[in-house]
């Protein structure tokens, strides 16, 4: 019995984290089910939902084949640390168990966007306020240049007139506590991103896809400070759920219903699953490679469209030739056909 309880605890610890779909367009189909998704394949799910290829096939039944000719214009990935799952409203959200919760990044997706849409300068924003880590490329440099990213900037932003402090029910949270301010500053970042994007709506209407990756650790710090059973943690969790729902609705609306908003909740990352060793049998790299970055070929945005057009036209022509040949081969012209008719000269001779 004790062994069974231990196994249940281990399973709950491994599969307690969640990967949720807050919003998705009709062209991206996520099936309802309890299929676990490995943590290291989260970037592949984001890439496939945007229409990009991945190195390894993803045999996960949660993501179905959607409309190949209508891909989402934006992917928004929000990762919340410090909690297994949030009390999201049932029915409006699709959630899957997350196994092997290892640290991941969307750098591969960002690189695909840069290589395919380098001339259109799409918006790529990766932000972790608690670590003061920010990565902005393309039009994000000009649009989000006023976004508060450092802790000092976030603190000053909170005490301005149009901050979220004036609209959020703080309840047990305090404005004078650094941990609480860190949590509230992350909510301010969510609000500012949607607010800045609403002033530049033309960015959400271009042909290049956009990527937003946000890492929120404020709830984790509140749990460490007050405890997960504290009133502060419960209030912060409820405030975060409301803020995430509003943020998802705003981003989904700004992109005209053509955006995927995803949420990853992780209690803690399992760093023991990360392999950092190298084998001594690893093949040696060339001393002077032609390209040290191993860059992929730059394909045109219309590559998949043209390929499908040529493919189906060739299939249609091949079927037309086969059907025509079959009909000619089995054609019975009959005795009234011109093939069997006799000329007038032949009739006179007879």
UniProtKB/Swiss-Prot annotation:
Residues 324-350 are cytoplasmic. It comes from the Eukaryota. It is found in: Endoplasmic reticulum membrane; Lysosome membrane; Cytoplasmic vesicle, Autophagosome membrane; Cell projection, Dendritic spine membrane. GO terms for molecular function: signaling receptor activity. Expressed in brain, heart, placenta, liver, kidney and pancreas. Barely detectable in lung and skeletal muscles. In the kidney cortex it is restricted to the mesangium of glomeruli. In the coronary and kidney artery it is expressed in the subendothelium, associated to smooth muscles where it colocalizes with REN. Expressed in vascular structures and by syncytiotrophoblast cells in the mature fetal placenta. A motif (Mediates retrograde transport to the ER) lies at residues 346-350. The record marks 275-278 as: Cleavage. It is a single-pass type I membrane protein. The keyword DNA damage does not apply. GO terms for biological process: angiotensin maturation; central nervous system maturation; endosomal lumen acidification; eye pigmentation; Golgi lumen acidification; head morphogenesis; intracellular pH reduction; lysosomal lumen acidification. Keywords: Cell membrane, Cell projection, Cleavage on pair of basic residues, Congenital disorder of glycosylation, Cytoplasmic vesicle, Disease variant, Endoplasmic reticulum, Endosome, Epilepsy, Intellectual disability, Lysosome, Membrane, Neurodegeneration, Parkinsonism, Phosphoprotein, Postsynaptic cell membrane, Receptor, Signal, Synapse, Transmembrane, Transmembrane helix. The chain crosses the membrane at residues 303-323. Residues 17-302 are extracellular. Residues 1-16 form the signal peptide. Changing residue 98 to S: In CDG2R; impairs export from the ER and cleavage, increases N-glycosylation post-translational modification which targets the misfolded protein to degradation via the ER-associated degradation pathway, results in loss of interaction with ATP6AP1. Phosphorylated. Proteolytically cleaved by a furin-like convertase in the trans-Golgi network to generate N- and C-terminal fragments. GO terms for cellular component: autophagosome membrane; axon; clathrin-coated vesicle membrane; dendritic spine membrane; endoplasmic reticulum membrane; endosome membrane; external side of plasma membrane; extracellular exosome. Changing residue 346 to Q: Increases cleavage and stability enhancing localization to the Golgi. Interacts with renin. Accessory component of the multisubunit proton-transporting vacuolar (V)-ATPase protein pump. Interacts (via N-terminus) with ATP6AP1 (via N-terminus). Interacts with ATP6V0D1; ATP6V0D1 is a V-ATPase complex subunit and the interaction promotes V-ATPase complex assembly. Interacts with TMEM9; TMEM9 is a V-ATPase assembly regulator and the interaction induces the interaction with ATP6V0D1. Interacts with VMA21 (via N-terminus); VMA21 is a V-ATPase accessory component. It is linked to Intellectual developmental disorder, X-linked, syndromic, Hedera type: A disorder characterized by significantly below average general intellectual functioning associated with impairments in adaptive behavior and manifested during the developmental period. MRXSH patients manifest mild to moderate intellectual disability associated with epilepsy, delays in motor milestones and speech acquisition in infancy. Multifunctional protein which functions as a renin, prorenin cellular receptor and is involved in the assembly of the lysosomal proton-transporting V-type ATPase (V-ATPase) and the acidification of the endo-lysosomal system. May mediate renin-dependent cellular responses by activating ERK1 and ERK2. By increasing the catalytic efficiency of renin in AGT/angiotensinogen conversion to angiotensin I, may also play a role in the renin-angiotensin system (RAS). This is Renin receptor. It comes from Homo sapiens (Human). The lineage of its organism: Eukaryota, Metazoa, Chordata, Craniata, Vertebrata.
